Amino acid sequence: MTEQKYIVALDQGTTSSRAVILDHDANIVSSSQREFTQIYPKAGWVEHDPMEIWATQSSTLVEALAKAGIRSDELAGIGITNQRETTIVWNKETGKPVYNAIVWQCRRTADICEDLKARGLEDYVRDNTGLVLDPYFSGTKVKWILDNVEGAREDAEAGKLLFGTVDTWLVWKMTQGRVHVTDYTNASRTMLFNINDLCWDQKLLDEMGIPSSMMPEVKRSSEVYGQTNLGGKGGTRIPIAGIAGDQQAALYGQMCVEAGQAKNTYGTGCFLLMNTGQEKVTSKNGLLTTLACGPKGEPAYALEGAVFMGGASIQWLRDEMKLLAGAEDSEYFATKVDSSNGVYVVPAFTGLGAPYWDAYARGTIVGLTRGVNSNHIIRATLEGIAYQTRDVLDAMQADSGIKLANLRVDGGAVANNFLMQFQSDVLDTEVHRPEVTEVTALGAAYLAGLAVGFWDSIDELQDKAVLNRTFMPHHDEEKRNRRYKGWKRAIKCAQVWSELHDDDDEE
């Protein structure tokens, strides 16, 4: 029998699908990535094609193996991590989606959320799912599909349709329709899962008109869910052994497995998570209570603050504003000036997430004067990412009563030294950047590897977390507080705009 030398992480993100292959020392030996189409049918609507998600994800695995000359029988297992909340409904008989995937960023269900609030469900949702009633989560997206796609509700009630977040869709495709599962971390992001009883919430399913027959079975984040045949019929059978939503996978990859440990991922959005162990902390400051992974992949509680626009605001500078040739250029231009010249950029392009939860706020640039140039705008955009992180961290520390000694960071934007230093300054906290910043993939690989015995224990993995750099805070307290006060004023401007806004303005 061939020695199983490798573990695979499939990392299905908002803009691309990736496959990462790791060896026993948790070194990345091969990877492949493919971007896929972003679909914007109307203002504030965001969709993906589920078949394109599957095609790009499956092809990256084949490419990653081929790049390194690795045979499928050398793989010990596969872990999956995914963009969360993004909603797919498909026909289990044909295997075809009934509609495009509705992406977590999509705001089309704001009116459904307002209706549920009017029916008095806001407190019930918070107390039982840990979430706020917001279009961000899966529940209202499922309802929208059933209400708006011809024949969908009838087929759902006849037991023909299945719902899944992206992990569920991938596992279903990889097992050729044999396995319909999700894990606790992804289930906790649907606004349909009771995090007190750890089961689907029948009251919420009934309130949204979603048949329970559509829902996947919920399992731990580290166990064997099924096998996939690599190479088609008669190919090598590889266990699918780990699933976690991208942010919980990153928390695990950073080895934040004990209460009080926290990380921030700077991806499309920014996501700050703090593990609270077996204690469910209910936020009084606009944060979410969600499920994460304990040391063995068992469900644990966490506090989360979600910022919708992180790295995506740098992409906006590049793609829409044409101020950058490449996202990596933002650091160079930001450091060409010694301040943002009084400018604040609030990137509320799809509303504001934690701790504000304002679906109607919109992007705002304030403080413009005649002396402001493009470098100031670029710098202010990067600073806006850091300020949003402070908004969340302040709320998190207030809820938990824990003052963080440091913040562990990961994601594409952490390569930006200006952003990381400014983050440390605005938080007055050490920022720790790991040597391997692919911690989302690491987390999925670790969960799968532990389930199949590729690694023996969490202790074996703790030693693999090597720091690349520690950023120390520089700013004095008076300067820090003055600048943050300006940010809070800018946030108010973004929110007041929505209060004054009329749909006729866009005609």
UniProtKB/Swiss-Prot annotation:
GO terms for biological process: glycerol catabolic process; glycerol metabolic process; glycerol-3-phosphate metabolic process. Pathway: Polyol metabolism; glycerol degradation via glycerol kinase pathway; sn-glycerol 3-phosphate from glycerol: step 1/1. Inhibited by fructose 1,6-bisphosphate (FBP). GO terms for molecular function: ATP binding; glycerol kinase activity. Key enzyme in the regulation of glycerol uptake and metabolism. Catalyzes the phosphorylation of glycerol to yield sn-glycerol 3-phosphate. Belongs to the FGGY kinase family. This is Glycerol kinase. It comes from Vibrio atlanticus (strain LGP32) (Vibrio splendidus (strain Mel32)). The lineage of its organism: Bacteria, Pseudomonadati, Pseudomonadota, Gammaproteobacteria, Vibrionales. The gene is glpK.
